[in-house]
Amino acid sequence: MSDALIRLEQVGVSFAGEAVLDSIDLAVAPGQIVTLIGPNGAGKTTLVRAVLGLLKPHRGKVWRKPKLRIGYMPQKIQVDATLPLSVLRFLRLVPGVDRAAALSALQEVGAEQVIDSPIQTISGGEMQRVLLARALLREPELLVLDEPVQGVDVVGQTELYNLITRLRDRHGCGVLMVSHDLHLVMSATDQVVCLNRHVCCSGHPEQVSNDPAFVELFGQNAKSLAVYHHHHDHSHDLHGSVIAPGAHVHGEHCKHG
């Protein structure tokens, strides 16, 4: 992908001799939405750290567009309840940000009403929008969103997915999004990558938003959601390692003579 914002080539990371990521190929282009899914312990957080430049891979390479501006939205933040920190002061921790810039970013995500609120008092959905506004303050070419809809109900997920799509359209930025849901993803996703230490499979989410049964289940939210069908050609054991074809895996249903 010649116009990629970021490209990972055969990236591998090991901790204490144990492979956490193995032979990862991944690229994100301007205007493209890539959703990364996988079970707990699959290496999603490690991959994000490599993308952000917080971790140097032991193998392979990470190429970034020169002077690439990245906006990062973490899963969550912990703020001491006794710390006198308003949303405005939190956003102004980003260098060069004044009240006007903070207000503009909050307006873009629909959260301008909380600008003077103590950050500890805002709702979970409002916090997600504040974190997204903070990511936008860098005028990013690439948005990295770590489980942006975690802990949000289906209606809230739909609103956030629609917002992310509008931001992509408005700014033309690429989006790398980590999702905790293995099957239900944002319908605007261009590519889904299933990770479990290595890339198990990848492809486009299936557009099922017009299916009557899907619409009945999710109502007006159906248009923002899509189902991703995995097409693995292998299985993993409980530790994440690939099981060799024909190998026996011990479990509760084993019968030994």
Swiss-Prot record:
One of its GO terms (biological process) is response to zinc ion. Its EC number is 7.2.2.20. It is an enzyme of class 7 (translocase). Keywords: ATP-binding, Cell inner membrane, Cell membrane, Ion transport, Membrane, Nucleotide-binding, Translocase, Transport, Zinc, Zinc transport. GO terms for molecular function: ABC-type zinc transporter activity; ATP binding; ATP hydrolysis activity. ATP binds at residues 38-45. InterPro entries: AAA+_ATPase, ABC_transporter-like_ATP-bd, ABC_transporter-like_CS, Metal_Ion_Import_ABC, P-loop_NTPase. Its main location: membrane. Belongs to the ABC transporter superfamily. Zinc importer (TC 3.A.1.15.5) family. This is Zinc import ATP-binding protein ZnuC. It comes from Pseudomonas entomophila (strain L48).
